[in-house]
Amino acid sequence: MSNLEKQIRLKNLLESLNGSKSQADLKKESQTLIDIFKQTRQKMIHDQQSNLHPVTSIQGKKLLNLRKALQNHQKHRDNIKVVKTNAEPVSTHDQTVDSNSDSSSSETLIDTSTSSSFDNIKRWLHETNSNESQSKGRPSEYTHVNSPDSGVSSKSGQLSMLTQDSNQILLLIKQLTAKYNMLESFFINSFEQLIALFDNFYFLSSLIGFNTSNSNSKITRLLRNFIKQASKIWLVIIFLTVKNLFIRMIKLNRTEKKVKLERDILMSRSPNSSIQYEYDAMLLTIRTSKISTFLEMLGNVNEFAFYLIQVMNWKVSKKVKNILAGISWIMSIYRMSKDEIQETNPSINNGLKSSDDIIDEYA
């Protein structure tokens, strides 16, 4: 998104604050705050990683003010939802009803004077950016939103058309990617239990030693043929699983760096802030997920090597096969115990963000 589009978006946002706001309007405003917060955070993280300029206290103030504004706005929305649910009377100072609205509408209308978060946005736009422009000796990225510009309307029309086309293409790509990931996850999860059963079967068969005894019997030949054909299917499934785990590990490492950098930016602005607990909790969740992902990768790579030997008919000693089968069996026990812990203790991560939520937030 270009600077001009950001200016137009913020201008329209602030100009729309002159009347009463419904729950739908508050939801849109909250999403806008989230978008602005993510754009500002990504810009500072990119500049810091690219060594374009050192992180200043003004940038830390930007991010801290935006985070506080977002939290206050979401708290305000939650309070309004509680009032609406309990059907308690609300004073006219905190609530106004639009006379032109439909009488059948049951939405609660809120006076914009209670939206203190947007006052923080205004102060952030008018104060911190002007200070940053003076300190760097260049125009601010976010200019004064109320200053009129004669060429904005014509340029905004062209930019909006290009932006809509590009957004539609990106949205289509995201939808197709999401559908493929859902299909792939469903395919892998459907065969995951069968893979565990197959690991247990081969491990027990290797202990019994039916591969060496009665090698010419009909049952032995059928079992060998079944193992060889089934290994081809398991090989594809495990390859997809290893690929997903490798991508997840990359995302976790990237997210961990962003969380650390954002924590350093905010702590440099407010060293005694209690916000450090939130970032420490996120880092702990990420590191725990990295360990779990690494163990999953190790087990799946072992299984990939094991099934590859079966498919390619490589000459490997029985000792190596037994070791690979034993590791696969141990990993199947680890997976079952991990799933059991998550099912019996659903509140183990109560109050904390999951690693997937953190990855999506910093994507």
UniProtKB/Swiss-Prot annotation:
Its job: Controls peroxisome morphology and abundance under conditions of peroxisome proliferation such as oleate and methanol media. Has additional function(s), which is not present in its functional homologs such as Saccharomyces cerevisea PEX34 or human PEX16.
Intervals, Peroxisomal compartment: 214-232
Protein name stated in the entry: Peroxin-36
GO BP term, example: peroxisome organization
Keywords carried by this UniProt record: Membrane, Peroxisome, Peroxisome biogenesis, Transmembrane, Transmembrane helix
Phenotype of null mutants: Induces pexophagy during peroxisome proliferation conditions. Leads to a delay in peroxisome formation and a serious growth defect in carbon sources requiring peroxisome biogenesis, with an extended lag phase and slow doubling time, at least in methanol medium. Results in less numerous, clustered, and bigger oleate-induced peroxisomes and more numerous, clustered, and smaller methanol-induced peroxisomes.
Residues on Cytoplasmic side: 1-193, 251-363
Bias (Low complexity) ranges: 97-114
